[in-house]
Regions:
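A short, proline-enriched helix->beta-strand linker immediately N-terminal to the Walker B motif
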Residues: 78-82
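ABC ATPase nucleotide-binding domain helical subdomain, centered on the C-loop/LSGGQ "ABC signature"
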Residues: 30, 34-49, 53-57, 152, ...
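Conserved ABC ATPase signature
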Residues: 58-63, 67
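P-loop NTP-binding/switch modules centered on Walker-like glycine-rich loops
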Residues: 85-89, 93-174
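Hydrophobic anchor residue at the start of the ABC signature
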Residues: 21, 73, 97, 101
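Short catalytic/signature loops enriched in Gly
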Residues: 50-53, 144-236
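Short helical segment in ABC ATPase nucleotide-binding domains corresponding to the A-loop/adjacent helical element
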Residues: 4, 8, 14-27, 37, ...
Length: 236
């Protein structure tokens, strides 16, 4: 199942929450209208929506952002999925509601034994919920491995710069780290490492060699020529 970033634009404005949930249930399950309504009510209660009976008859615009996202989560649970893809599910929410939604997703994951694939740029979300991380740049995975390892000891230059851009509490005034340059156009991906033109450690081979994922000594895999050369030297 899929949880979209903005539930206000994905939930139909002309139909009630209950109508949309019941439709999703009956499209995939051959059950009566009454049974589908009972299932929809149960799902709303599972995602901790208060006064669930009343919310069944509410329209999306009558709900808060957090409530709408809970409805989206309920809809994602309709067919008891083994995997949920959550695309920036907390971006449009304030910090307090964001924490509630993340806690809800985590508890649902544990209770139902399902997996969640988070698409996010928020390292707070990553550190709170994710067991493993895959960092992507220009449509390619450039580094993957255990969350704690990657956040503490990133191997790819892009991952390092990305983490450095996160403001640190208690640092006081100072310049915010940035990554120079711009990402490449996706219809003109350069050969070699797509990050080479923005990387301070790039060499000519970075721009001319197809770089494969390489295992590192700290249980991660990285798409960087520095690690490819290092592995070749060890093998020799």
């Amino acid at each position: 199942s899929y949880i979209f970033q903005d539930p206000l634009s994905t939930l139909h404005p002309l139909y009630t929450v209950g109508h949309q949930l019941i439709e999703a249930i009956r499209v995939h399950q051959s059950i009566s209208l009454e049974s589908a309504k009972s299932r929809a009510l149960s799902l709303l209660k599972n995602v901790q929506i208060p006064n669930a009976e009343e919310r069944l008859n509410a329209y999306p615009h009558e709900l808060s952002g957090g409530m709408r996202q809970r409805v989206s989560i309920a809809m994602a649970l309709v067919n008891d999925p083994e995997l949920i893809i959550a695309d920036e599910p907390t971006t449009a929410l304030d910090v307090t509601v964001q924490s509630q939604i993340l806690n809800l997703l985590d508890s649902l994951r544990r209770e139902r034994g399902l997996a969640i694939l988070f698409i996010t740029h928020d390292f707070g979300v990553v550190s709170q919920l994710c067991d493993r991380v895959a960092v992507m740049y220009a449509g390619q995975i450039v580094e993957q491995g255990p969350t704690e390892t990657i956040l503490k000891s990133p191997s790819h230059p892009y991952t390092s710069r990305l983490i450095a851009c996160v403001p640190k509490i208690g640092r006081g005034q100072g310049s915010l780290e940035t990554i120079p340059g711009l990402p490449p156009s996706l219809d003109k991906i350069p050969r070699g490492c797509a990050f080479a033109n923005r990387c301070a450690n790039a060499v000519e081979a970075c721009r001319s060699t197809d770089i494969k994922m390489t295992a590192t000594t700290n249980r991660t895999h990285v798409r960087c020529i520095a690690y490819s050369f290092e592995k070749q030297e060890i093998m020799q």
